[in-house]
């Protein structure tokens, strides 16, 4: 008899804007975790999709068997909750496509465990390196010091990721080594926002309301600005923070 599947894999949401690669006629998108078991191979992944046909070209899965539902991490779990619960390692950031000094290209993404991986977009997404921006082991869970959620930035020398409590990390895309780490003063300050880079300067927002300007060469702080203050708006009303 014919068998009809009533339920198929769910999850793998795309949190982020896709990255366009005109040279290969492809777009790249990061995906989240699965919400049903067994998880699809395209969850917690970067997917390359043909820009003309919409067909999948290749996919790199950063975390396997990650089935997670936000309403299931409390004491009252329903029968619909996955067991065991996965580590919740979504790739929430847009992939970064950059060209190395050698002319070779690299596609980078980050996970909630602060893992950063580089793929070869010209070789079916072959893994170039995988490292941890927080300085810990790769493949860990969210119990570590750092987490990458919202995105990074790149220039000719480095790729930059705000790794939460682990600070702002500059990574050499040729080797996967950390060039420097900026950690602001004060306890419990997380740098989770996506940084912005211009020639010579990286801008990074903090959970303490501070905006930091950091030297792209060595990670030294250039200045800081406290956004938690009163501002006069365009209609002369005063707003705070």
What are these model-predicted stretches?
Residues 13-14:
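Long, compositionally biased, intrinsically disordered segments
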Residues 1-9, 21-27, 36-91, 96-241:
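Extracytoplasmic/lumenal domain signature
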């Amino acid at each position: 008899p014919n068998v009809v599947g009533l339920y198929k894999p769910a999850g793998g949401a795309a949190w982020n804007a896709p990255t366009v690669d005109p040279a290969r006629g492809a777009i790249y998108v990061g995906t989240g975790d699965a919400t049903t078991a067994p998880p699809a191979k395209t969850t917690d992944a970067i997917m390359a999709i043909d820009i003309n046909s919409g067909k999948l070209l290749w996919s790199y899965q950063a975390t396997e068997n990650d089935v997670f539902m936000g309403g299931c991490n409390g004491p009252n779990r329903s029968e619909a909750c996955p067991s065991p619960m996965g580590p919740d390692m979504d790739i929430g950031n847009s992939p970064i496509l950059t060209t190395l000094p050698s002319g070779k290209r690299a596609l980078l993404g980050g996970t909630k465990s602060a893992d950063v991986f580089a793929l070869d977009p010209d070789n079916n997404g072959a893994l170039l390196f995988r490292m941890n921006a927080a300085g810990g082991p790769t493949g860990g869970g969210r119990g570590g010091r750092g987490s990458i959620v919202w995105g990074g930035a790149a220039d000719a020398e480095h790729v930059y990721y705000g790794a939460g409590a682990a600070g702002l990390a500059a990574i050499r895309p040729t080797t996967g080594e950390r060039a420097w780490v900026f950690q602001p003063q004060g306890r419990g300050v997380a740098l989770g926002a996506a940084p912005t880079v211009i020639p010579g300067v990286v801008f990074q927002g903090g959970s303490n309301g501070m905006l930091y300007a950091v030297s792209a060469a060595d990670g030294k702080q250039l200045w800081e600005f406290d956004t938690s203050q009163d501002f006069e708006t365009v209609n002369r009303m005063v707003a705070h923070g």
